[in-house]
Amino acid sequence: MHPMLNIAIRAVRKGGNFIIQNYERRKFVKEDVEKNKVFLNNIIYKTNKIISEIIHKSYPYHTILKKHENILVKKNEKNTVWIITELDGKTNFLKYFPYFCVSIAVVVKNKTEISVIYDPIKNDLFTAVKGQGSQLNGYRTRCSAINTLNYSTVAVNPSNKIHNLTSSYFEIYKKLIISGISFRCTGSSILDSAYVAAGKIDCLFDFNLDPNKFVASKLQVREAGCLINNFMGEYEHNNNNYSGNITSSSKFIRLINEKIRECYLI
């Protein structure tokens, strides 16, 4: 096993265990928004501290990306950078909806070498090493081989700025629903991407392209055989927050893009 992968797994499991302890204690009150915010920030801070201590114990000279920093500004960073997402699916956590995760990505010389996504509820560990494929709990994963839109499952991470979306986006949704697609809006795009990599979900539409989250997700899906396109058919687009990405197999993306083109031709 890659030595940094071993440390990443150890760190993400310990961080996930801390989150689960607080999830099961249920100290937060659903109706008290301000108290929940303080409680959640405290959990995130302590989780980051737990994970960071494990990383720095083995790699004291590596950089851990700070919460307010963006990986895009670190593109010329020569040092190894660790990107931690302490809790993806915060609303789910507060609502007792058991769908959230912890993730770590390791970037070496501007290339993502390792990705670890951990679902502490199910104890599912998704790992990926560049050039060595992706795994779920030690077993190799591949993306879905479905070649029809009918009966397919697509996860959606809708835009936080939905008012900026044009009516054409809603026409696309309508067209795809009529084609037989079943949409899911789960609240954790990182875990969705891991499910796409494992073939549990056929495709992911992501309109909230957080670059830091995108790093861990991208390696997982690419190592599982997925492509990442935007809705215009262009490859791997992660800068425009409104265009969104489609993550799936090349065959399924081609089917999606055909339906999208039909919308623009009508």
From Swiss-Prot:
This protein's encoding gene: suhB
Xref: SUPFAM superfamilies: Carbohydrate phosphatase
Gene Ontology CC: one annotated term: cytoplasm
Keywords in alphabetical order: Chaperone, Cytoplasm, Hydrolase, Ribosome biogenesis, RNA-binding, Transcription, Transcription antitermination, Transcription regulation
Protein name: Nus factor SuhB
Top-level taxon: Bacteria
Family annotation (PANTHER family): INOSITOL MONOPHOSPHATASE (PTHR20854), INOSITOL-1-MONOPHOSPHATASE-RELATED (PTHR20854:SF4)
Catalysed reactions listed for this entry: a myo-inositol phosphate + H2O = myo-inositol + phosphate
Transmembrane segments: none
